């Protein structure tokens, strides 16, 4: 039976929902993030705020929340010519992929996370990648994650489990999952409390915009990440209203 987990935690909506899920399942949960000189570097500030808010608002989870790890991955920014690591406009490439795709990003993240998990004796890695609302990123595919799980388990001679709780659900369902997890957290009114925390403190916008406040949170409102988050929130609210 697995009792420990390492969550790849960027400070965004998806990884915060994954963190809540891990805290609801496991006895000890640690977090990891990567500074690869991303344009939306504000997410690294957001994640610390989110961690503090979880500790303050959800005491039963706080007792399980362990060490946070931040790794410097500047080399990824140096070898990547994308709109997430360069000041360039968002567009679709001839390959059919958006220029927000950072080649090898999730592969490196998982490899380094596995090395930390190995050292910290953490049995499960949890990541928020998904195929449903994704932008065509090949390193978010279920097949990719399963291949990485096998390669890392063989290469480190340790059986790793990579959980992807959002793999087959869309953004509306991700909002709903956050509400459900909050309701089961032991905190009175925890469902809305977790949704409000995600709205107010998590960061998704590729441009790093924390000036413009929307019903679903902060962001420019026009980048692909903001559009996905906004549409998901609208559908979530509509479903809640419909009952």
Curated annotation (Swiss-Prot):
Keywords: ATP-binding, Ligase, Metal-binding, Nucleotide-binding, Queuosine biosynthesis, Zinc. It holds the Pfam family QueC. It catalyses: 7-carboxy-7-deazaguanine + NH4(+) + ATP = 7-cyano-7-deazaguanine + ADP + phosphate + H2O + H(+). Its cofactor is Zn(2+). ATP binds at residues 9-19. InterPro entries: QueC (IPR018317), Rossmann-like_a/b/a_fold (IPR014729). Catalyzes the ATP-dependent conversion of 7-carboxy-7-deazaguanine (CDG) to 7-cyano-7-deazaguanine (preQ(0)). This is 7-cyano-7-deazaguanine synthase. It comes from Albidiferax ferrireducens (strain ATCC BAA-621 / DSM 15236 / T118) (Rhodoferax ferrireducens). The lineage of its organism: Bacteria, Pseudomonadati, Pseudomonadota, Betaproteobacteria, Burkholderiales.
